[in-house]
Design a protein with these regions (language model features):
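Short, Lys/Arg-rich, polar N-terminal cytosolic tail immediately upstream
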Residues: 1-13
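A structural signal for multi-pass alpha-helical bundles of membrane permease subunits
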Residues: 15-259
Length: 259
């Protein structure tokens, strides 16, 4: 009996050691790129920090990136939150599956296949070289609709039925029941949307011609690779907001689930 317990403890200890080693390897693999990004920035000279056309170019690109990220996430969440709720509330199972399959189809469709139709649409409505054109082309996010649909399906239908019996309208059901319950999903979706908009590259390359409207990802791509320290410093400034936002989102979501 004691021998079996000792063997179990030894096996458990070996498993913990193995998991610890694997975790350490994974940590090193994830941390090394950050080290290679941060440490070269200490060798940069202050006079070389702004070797672009001007400091205002970098600030303008940062502003454009912030506009795309903040305005984009607001538009996407309003559309996806409403669409996810509407699909979940459809009484017909076939109709619900039709919308879900449509979202999955657009989710699996390569983004490059939509570039030409999007370009033609923006050209015909006169929004080709503008940030609002980019915002419109990124407003529909199938993955976000599916996420909010999944969140809505997890809500007990008796909550909606009881509120409906008390005279609540669909707007009240949406605002008082659905939105508060799915708030953690909204937080996660907002972060993923901001991260995607922050790193947007293909659409700006295709739809924007005026350099004053370029996001920061375009400016970084066009920087010369001769000065690696400068590029690392600007990349670090580029990712710092996302890192801060990530930890804020993790803290917010974990606190909500623990409540």
């Amino acid at each position: 009996m004691f021998g079996e317990k000792k063997e179990e403890r030894a096996m458990k200890s070996r498993k913990e050691t193995t998991y610890g080693i694997l975790l350490l390897i994974a940590t090193v693999l994830f941390v090394l790129p950050c080290i290679f990004l941060v440490f070269p920035t200490f060798d940069i000279h202050r006079d070389d920090l702004w070797q672009m056309d001007s400091l205002m170019e970098f600030i303008c690109a940062y502003k454009n990136t912030a506009i795309l990220a903040i305005a984009g996430v607001l538009i996407q969440i309003v559309i996806a939150l409403s669409a996810g709720y509407a699909i979940a509330r459809v009484s017909s199972f076939k109709a619900q599956m039709f919308f879900i399959v449509t979202c999955v189809f657009f989710l699996l469709l390569p983004q490059q296949a939509l570039m030409l139709p999007q370009y033609l649409v923006l050209m015909n409505i006169g929004w080709l070289d503008s940030l609002k054109g980019l915002l419109m082309m990124t407003a529909f996010q199938p993955w976000m609709i599916l996420l909010f649909w999944f969140a809505a399906k997890r809500i007990d239908s008796s909550l909606f039925d009881a509120a409906t019996c008390d005279g609540a309208s669909n707007w009240v059901l949406f605002r008082k029941i659905y939105v508060p319950i799915v708030r953690p999903y909204v937080t996660v979706a907002a972060f993923l949307s901001i991260a995607e908009s922050w790193n947007l590259l293909e659409q700006p390359m295709t739809f924007l011609q005026n350099k004053e409207k370029y996001p920061l990802s375009m400016i970084l791509m066009q920087l010369s690779t001769d000065n690696a320290e400068l590029k690392n410093a600007l990349c670090l400034l580029f990712v710092i907001p996302l890192i801060i936002l990530f930890f804020r989102v993790v803290d917010n979501v974990t606190n909500r689930f623990h409540q």
